């Protein structure tokens, strides 16, 4: 690739300015939840893969966790398997779980692995069933149907939450040149498979390995105040206040809960990142401004 002198100087300046960040994060583990537009736009896909390879090359240990809800929905439709949702969660019987495993652990996972390998990295695709490193337990949801006086606990099938994470399995990758790409499928002691929310898996993996950062890629610009302004830096106490006054609500709550849990468990910072921005992960790591909202135990300005 040919550069003009001016362009070459700009590149050199960027590389030089990134040195303090490289020194700070070398040897650290970053857990990145990959989803949203970043997973469906070809240019963003290629950029994400290169960014992950770059992290590994400079000594950062990235762990990628991915979702795949739309792809699961598409495959179920092709197979004429009807999807039913309760409180936004897919009811997952045995037949549906077979499709979930096929799509998440096969199609989507291997597409991401291939992207990273094409960018020059050495990625390996795994699910929580490999070495049973993600133990799961069944998730029951509270649901109040029309006419009911109180909510009831509903069994929605093979949908779970993380019971534990075997860190020794993940440490193997940290000490190698392999980049783990995790499909969010867990397993219980009886060998039953469970589909787990990818944000939740990313958060619990970050907690278990003592990650420096948890990064959740989304299709929004970050956490916003009631006027629509992006809040670039928040303490956990400030986030609690924003939840209490209704600023943070709805679909953002599960992501924020994962981020809060991770930070409260010792992860240095969690980031809600705009995955629609090219190279969003690098911008969040190697610049002061970033492209989303940083959540930590420190108030902004301290």
From Swiss-Prot:
Q: Which cysteines does the record link by disulfide bonds? A: none
Predominant subcellular localization, coarse grouping: cytoplasm
Q: In which pathway does it act?
A: Amino-acid biosynthesis; L-arginine biosynthesis; N(2)-acetyl-L-ornithine from L-glutamate: step 2/4
Q: Quote one Gene Ontology molecular function term.
A: ATP binding
What is the protein name stated in its UniProt record? Acetylglutamate kinase
Family (UniProt): Belongs to the acetylglutamate kinase family. ArgB subfamily.
Question: Which SUPFAM superfamilies does this entry report, sorted A to Z?
Answer: Carbamate kinase-like
